[in-house]
Amino acid sequence: MSASPAIFLCEPFTKSCGELQPEPCGLIIFGASGDLTRRKLLPALWRLYQRRRLPARFYILGCARSAYTPEEFRLSLQKALPLDSTVNEAEITAFFKHIDYLSGDYSSLVFYEELKEKLKHLDEYHQLKGNHLFYLATPPNLTEDIVSGLGSCGLAAQHTSSLPLRWSRLIVEKPFGTS
């Protein structure tokens, strides 16, 4: 049996550990219409959701160049879920209420302004403080455009003391290079 995906905090001298509940946040996946999201990311997030390992308040925003509506995107992802006989329709519906989609050109500053507005709306709707985890499931040649775009509209900037609890994180999935 594999280890639980929970986050643990261990005291260095007492060796006692306790599980931490992740902070409420928005997970923004660039390259969301791709194979990595369908085969790996979404099934992993689904399993975390089923095991109550995601924050109580969260959302997943898929971003990609593919021109899907949010409904079309959710439908395409639903086909990728690892479902078994214990899963009920209400649980699937509840999970997909946390998923939205935004299409656009990663090299366009207009896209990042739209993203900023979308995140503001989703943060308000899900009652979040503006914590964002940006996940780049994209080819390496798109990394610079995405990071520059996030920085240009203030989404990846270090936050000021006026919002001390707000954070942004960036995960780059793809290795750099061509081989």
List the predicted regions and their residue ranges.
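A structured beta-alpha segment of the ubiquitous adenosine-cofactor-binding alpha/beta core
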Residues: P82-G130, G151-A156
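Glycine-rich phosphate-binding loop and adjoining beta1-alpha1-beta2 segment
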Residues: Q50-S103
